[in-house]
């Protein structure tokens, strides 16, 4: 390679790096403005962190190409012009972030590297990272005089009149009368309960609701009319004293204790020595997070000794003596590598996104549902796109954003398959429906497999020990084709022992569970058949209304529509199901194999004793040994709806032994609590 060629190549590479920097700078600036100025962030904190880290990594790798207007050296953006602007006496810095135990160890190593041998391995103070708006409060001789937002870290906005309306902020501090200037910094936030009330009132009045408590708190403080802020449920949590701290107080933890004595609210905090102690406290707070009265998104770790804090100093944006240990992200960015189509038991085609594996909320996610073709069109998502994936608690991960400006060249729009990817039958998308379906029905192996899996599931025939893996294996080996074949597996016992190395004990347990499942209920049997549109509650209503299977199978569409929760479309689906010859053959084969149930005493569903009531079950039913599913079936037979969570609309809570938080919540809401002995009398089982 000649020198000219090498120079040209280097120049081209530099231009490519600069172009990427400019794109990231534009993105970070855009979201800085949305977050710090408008208080309407359009991406999650984690997505913002990832954009910023990408820019920092480029700048560290190519320092000579760092752009002069890079936002990595500043905290935020310009304050709003509608409030007067105030210069901070001491810059209000932001915090750096760490995300795992290795980051934590590295942070502590950096602290030690800047300390003398005698001062190394200092004690740390850990407190909650509150998710609100950072505010500085200033007092002159104990009198509150000014409240200012962080703004860009150097200049903030004067929100004094709004701050005065926050109930837990002391406006006069007698114990600070001898302190010329006292500056207290902290976070203004909106507790979860207040946030819910505020949004509920907004909905009732037809007003705009807030996306989250942080936006609600920030939006309330930015109101030009203090009366609006006064009407909002805001709270202030102090986290530092930046001017006026008595000389005798030399620790951050002691400063927080002093603030409490002055009348400020502070969050819980802990003093620790080692990285493992930090990690243990951090992990315990992840578990407690949902039960807190306010939102937190991590923990703040600070060197506890204030003298050492001064020695360690700060970078342009953040202190060296503190960092934010963020909780596992619930929204992260990754690459959508491909889109595949899966076929469900009713023939529904569901697009599934195959992701570059990524940690979301502490769990590795590699697949994400895209729901249906309409959702793909709405998102305008393509294979190769950068996407944001969200997962909260036990919620199934989903794509919440597609980064179209990061889309690589050469991608193509997703098209709906014309034929089933499994059986090659035509795919239809009925007019007015969002779900495309394979027309292969029982000809389609995917639908056959899903029907088998549904049939043995816990809420259907509840055949313990016959899991999805074995069912698919039996299906692929031709041993099981229809659900009725399950009850003839005993005829293949020897073959099953050698198949997939099941073993005699596993086969014996499986066959016993199959035999025990023959005694079932009509509602379970109806649900197990997998009729499209018939869920658990509808199956219960059908059983209660018709009493036995022959009456249901012979019902007209009009008769079916008379059943609660059964509309015209569902009635047609049920009617057609029982007129398909292969379905009749399977039902007959099941009954011939010994599947049976007790006839249900017919009742008009609107005359049931618990009709219109919503019940919740918690704890263990020890006296009867009854499972929650069986208790649920009894309650449904009496007309009740059974929910998984307690609310003000809950009619009663069935509480067994070791009832937990649901019982506490029910008692606080005044919900009727029914103990097991009363429940057994109610269902005639005592």
From Swiss-Prot:
Catalytic residues identified in the record: 129 (n6-amp-lysine intermediate)
GO BP field: DNA repair; DNA replication
Sequence positions that bind Zn(2+): 420, 423, 438, 444
PROSITE patterns named among the record's database cross-references: BRCT, DNA_LIGASE_N1, DNA_LIGASE_N2
GO cellular component, one term: cytosol
Catalytic activity: NAD(+) + (deoxyribonucleotide)n-3'-hydroxyl + 5'-phospho-(deoxyribonucleotide)m = (deoxyribonucleotide)n+m + AMP + beta-nicotinamide D-nucleotide
InterPro entries per UniProt: BRCT_dom, BRCT_dom_sf, DisA/LigA_HHH, DNA_ligase, DNA_ligase_AS, DNA_ligase_CS, DNAligase_adenylation, DNAligase_N
Entry keyword Zinc: yes
Cofactor(s), by name: Mg(2+); Mn(2+)
Family per record: Belongs to the NAD-dependent DNA ligase family. LigA subfamily.
Protein name: DNA ligase
Organism: Psychrobacter sp. (strain PRwf-1)
């Amino acid at each position: 390679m000649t020198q000219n060629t090498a120079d040209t190549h280097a120049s081209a590479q530099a231009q490519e790096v600069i172009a990427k920097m400019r794109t990231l700078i534009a993105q970070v600036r855009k979201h800085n403005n949305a977050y710090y100025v408008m208080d309407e962030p359009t991406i999650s904190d984690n997505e913002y962190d990832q954009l910023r880290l990408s820019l920092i990594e480029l700048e560290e790798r190519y320092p000579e190409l760092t752009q002069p207007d890079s936002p990595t050296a500043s905290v935020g953006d310009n304050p709003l012009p509608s409030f007067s602007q105030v210069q901070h006496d001491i810059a209000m810095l932001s915090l750096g972030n760490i995300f795992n135990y290795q980051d934590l160890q590295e942070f502590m190593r950096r602290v030690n590297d800047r300390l003398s041998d005698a001062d190394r391995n200092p004690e740390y103070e850990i407190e909650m990272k509150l998710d609100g708006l950072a505010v500085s409060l200033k007092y002159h001789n104990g009198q509150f005089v000014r409240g200012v937002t962080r703004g860009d870290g150097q200049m903030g906005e004067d929100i004094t009149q709004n701050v005065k309306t926050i109930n837990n902020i002391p406006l006069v501090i007698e114990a600070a009368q001898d302190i010329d200037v006292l500056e207290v910094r902290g976070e203004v936030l909106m507790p979860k309960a207040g946030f819910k009330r505020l949004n509920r009132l907004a909905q009732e009045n037809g007003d705009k609701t807030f996306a989250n408590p942080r936006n609600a708190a920030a939006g309330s403080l930015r109101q030009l009319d203090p009366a609006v802020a006064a009407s909002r449920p805001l709270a202030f949590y102090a986290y530092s004293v930046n001017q006026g701290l008595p000389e005798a107080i030399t620790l951050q933890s002691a400063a927080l204790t002093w603030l409490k004595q002055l009348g400020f609210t502070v969050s819980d905090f802990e003093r620790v020595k080692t990285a493992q102690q930090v990690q243990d406290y951090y992990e315990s707070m992840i578990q407690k997070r949902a039960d807190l009265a306010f939102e937190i998104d991590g923990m703040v770790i600070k060197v506890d000794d204030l003298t050492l804090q001064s020695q360690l100093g700060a970078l342009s944006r953040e202190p060296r003596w503190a960092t934010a240990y963020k909780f596992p992200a619930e929204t992260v960015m990754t690459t959508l590598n491909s889109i595949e189509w899966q076929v469900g038991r009713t023939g529904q085609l569901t697009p599934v996104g195959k992701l570059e594996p990524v940690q979301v909320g502490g769990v590795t996610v590699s697949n994400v549902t895209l729901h249906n073709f309409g959702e793909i069109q709405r998102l305008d998502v393509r294979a190769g796109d950068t996407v944001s994936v969200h997962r909260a608690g036990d919620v199934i991960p989903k794509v919440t954003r597609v980064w179209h400006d990061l889309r690589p060249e050469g991608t193509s729009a997703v098209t709906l398959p014309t034929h089933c990817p499994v059986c090659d039958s035509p795919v239809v998308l009925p007019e007015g429906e969002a779900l495309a379906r394979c027309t292969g029905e029982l000809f389609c192996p995917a639908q056959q497999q899903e029907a088998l899996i549904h049939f043995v599931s816990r809420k259907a025939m509840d055949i313990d020990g016959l899991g999805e893996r074995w069912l698919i294996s039996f299906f692929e080996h031709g041993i099981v084709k229809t659900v009725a074949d399950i009850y003839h597996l005993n005829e293949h016992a020897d073959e099953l022992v050698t198949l997939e190395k099941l073993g005699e004990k596993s086969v014996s347990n499986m066959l016993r569970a199959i035999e025990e499942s023959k005694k079932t209920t009509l509602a379970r049997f109806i649900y197990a058949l997998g009729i499209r549109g018939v869920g658990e509650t509808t199956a219960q209503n059908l059983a209660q209304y018709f009493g036995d299977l022959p009456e249901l199978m012979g019902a007209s569409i009009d008769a079916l529509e008379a059943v609660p929760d059964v509309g015209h479309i569902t009635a047609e689906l049920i009617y057609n199901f029982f007129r398909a010859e292969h379905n009749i053959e399977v039902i007959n084969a099941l009954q011939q194999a010994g599947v049976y149930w007790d006839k249900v005493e017919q009742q008009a569903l609107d005359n049931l004793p618990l009709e219109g009531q919503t019940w919740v079950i918690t704890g263990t039913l020890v006296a009867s040994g009854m499972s929650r599913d069986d208790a649920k079936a009894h309650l449904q037979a009496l007309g009740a709806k059974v929910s998984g969570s307690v609310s003000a609309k809950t009619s009663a809570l069935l509480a067994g032994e070791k009832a937990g938080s649901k019982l506490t919540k029910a008692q606080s809401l005044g919900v009727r609590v029914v103990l097991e002995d009363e429940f057994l009398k109610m269902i005639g089982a005592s």
